[in-house]
Amino acid sequence: MPNMSSIKAEQQSGPLGGSSGYQVPVNMCTTTVANTTTTLGSSAGGATGSRHNVSVTNIKCELDELPSPNGNMVPVIANYVHGSLRIPLSGHSNHRESDSEEELASIENLKVRRRTAADKNGPRPMSWEGELSDTEVNGGEELMEMEPTIKSEVVPAVAPPQPVCALQPIKTELENIAGEMQIQEKCYPQSNTQHHAATKLKVAPTQSDPINLKFEPPLGDNSPLLAARSKSSSGGHLPLPTNPSPDSAIHSVYTHSSPSQSPLTSRHAPYTPSLSRNNSDASHSSCYSYSSEFSPTHSPIQARHAPPAGTLYGNHHGIYRQMKVEASSTVPSSGQEAQNLSMDSASSNLDTVGLGSSHPASPAGISRQQLINSPCPICGDKISGFHYGIFSCESCKGFFKRTVQNRKNYVCVRGGPCQVSISTRKKCPACRFEKCLQKGMKLEAIREDRTRGGRSTYQCSYTLPNSMLSPLLSPDQAAAAAAAAAVASQQQPHQRLHQLNGFGGVPIPCSTSLPASPSLAGTSVKSEEMAETGKQSLRTGSVPPLLQEIMDVEHLWQYTDAELARINQPLSAFASGSSSSSSSSGTSSGAHAQLTNPLLASAGLSSNGENANPDLIAHLCNVADHRLYKIVKWCKSLPLFKNISIDDQICLLINSWCELLLFSCCFRSIDTPGEIKMSQGRKITLSQAKSNGLQTCIERMLNLTDHLRRLRVDRYEYVAMKVIVLLQSDTTELQEAVKVRECQEKALQSLQAYTLAHYPDTPSKFGELLLRIPDLQRTCQLGKEMLTIKTRDGADFNLLMELLRGEH
């Protein structure tokens, strides 16, 4: 069928006084619904009226006439050029548009391009632009131009001087139509002419007929593309619009290109769109689930840079290979754990080694402070803490978080790995993000709900360079670390099974600890202490978010590594002298160590842990006074505590500081039955407490410690209990008691969910933990009374005395 054909239907008076007309087809687009009205020109009562001209499209048609069997002339399109089309139509000048019955009957009989049932069920274009083809849009042609008024006279249109297009196909098609009309006239009697003309022939448009407004350029061989379109339309499967509307431009870009690349090229593996990431995204432009060959922890921005010819670009396969290595090893050896802190450029060796290769061994025993003092592995800036799996600076932490949460898709304009440093880290975000992933930052550590507090319990995944480790470790320590790595490499798998804890089989790290829980003793990390910490650490994915946020600020409770280094420095200086000298010289060296350590001297503690001051109460007050400053800093960083007013914060601290101190001492003493561990390694037994009048208080603390040991309280339950004790809303001095109670209920719900999830065999554990709070409060009441009596005539301990005076 040709692209555009139109036949002039001219009514003439018949032999019976009626009117007879010739109806020839007008091409209608298959996607256009024929919801229009059509009037038959052969009605008996019709009268010939004035002729009207309706300007429909921007095409001029010149008409030829072909003879018909009864002697009438049928006008036929001879050629057309770009201009205006004038189609004379019959009808009355005051034609009414409400002839509904006759028009509906005409539509029922003629069946003019009605949509089939399959077409009604098929998809429809979202906008008018979806109806157009790429050629029409790109060519910039004006496709529809309608005149607002109907003229009453025939106005000849002047066509612009443009070449005539596609003359022969249109004339050939119209000659075929004329021949078909002759066959129909011969086959059917005159009485049934109207009926068969309505059912067999396609009529020309009258005044109420719909006119096709869509122009499609003519193609050779009678436009096979139109036939294919008609075939697909009849089948009920309409193709998607080739040019979607502008409001869906973002959707079209992401549905025809990978999320990790520019919409102009295709670099990535096939993917499956999904809404698992964020259902609130209006455009769904970044909701993708990749095929199984990609790890869920990989960046959505991979394979951006084309590798040079003849070379293997490591930024693509190195990350995937590393993930496969980690996934294949279920129980890492201690040698592998000793290499788990990697920060140097030697990690790029993963790009050129096989799957079975391992990292070069690096010495173990690195403290948190040594890691913080090292440069950022991504840009070389100063490290601010443990962020998303590695120690990094604040700038790279924020960049990684914004990139993942905002789903940024960066592309390197240089096409290769760019240098990332402090001065150039903002020039190429694509290479910077790839380096973040290579150094060990984890996508799953970013919170999708954008709440504060990341999942910082992920273990480090990079190794420290030997150049940085050599000045930090002594030769003996370096030799010991090398020996430990050699022994670990020869260790059999069945000998390493005891390194798995009882909470889901998580490997216990032997070289590093969680950043949120540094060593309580403050010395170098030991394997025994780290084993205990590993038993208490659980999988982060099953920990409630509130408990994880509380755990993230737990390190503020402890002394900093700088303070611990000041304490341990004199101990190492006088250790050799005290071992070779007599007891008197050892005593003098211990006294000298006490004098040279401000913290030990203020706390009244000696290097060997014995009480250097006979007044134990004064020592404990000094320790408590120093610890209270840490408690205040810890409270101000808690997620729930920050939402409370300043006056209520002070009131809560005054009422709970003693409970917090004693509860931390009891939890610290779980592994030492019969004695209470104080701060900085100080231990008090029941016999020592009797001689100082603290028997009742220490006895109650030992009883509470036994209950904690029996319940197997871990670190998450410990930090949750501290927050619950802090947010006690039963005091009358609170201004917003309801708000404090709501915060405490949130902590209670998180603790209950945690205990039920991790200890399903002991459902009563949550209730038993809460029963320990009244015992703790009674013990603290006794301790406060003793401190008030003992320190009435003693020295002033600043914050401790201020808190004691605030309660009385």
UniProtKB/Swiss-Prot annotation:
Belongs to the nuclear hormone receptor family. NR5 subfamily. The lineage of its organism: Eukaryota, Metazoa, Ecdysozoa, Arthropoda, Hexapoda. Monomer; forms a complex with ftz. GO terms for cellular component: nucleus. Keywords: Activator, DNA-binding, Metal-binding, Nucleus, Phosphoprotein, Receptor, Transcription, Transcription regulation, Zinc, Zinc-finger. PANTHER family: NUCLEAR HORMONE RECEPTOR FTZ-F1 BETA, NUCLEAR RECEPTOR SUBFAMILY 5 GROUP A. Residues 373-448 bind DNA. It comes from Drosophila melanogaster (Fruit fly). Its main location: nucleus. It is found in: Nucleus. It holds the Pfam family Hormone_recep. Acts as a cofactor to fushi tarazu (ftz). Facilitates the binding of ftz to DNA. Binds the sequence element 5'-YCYYGGYCR-3' in the zebra element of ftz. Probably also functions as a receptor for a yet unknown ligand. Residues 1-20, 114-133, 209-289, 325-366, 516-540 are annotated as: Disordered. Residues 580-808 form the NR LBD domain. The modification Phosphoserine is found at S90, S98, S100, S106, S127, S276. This is Nuclear hormone receptor FTZ-F1 beta. A zinc finger (NR C4-type) spans 376-396, 412-436. The keyword Transcription applies. GO terms for biological process: regulation of DNA-templated transcription; spermathecum morphogenesis.
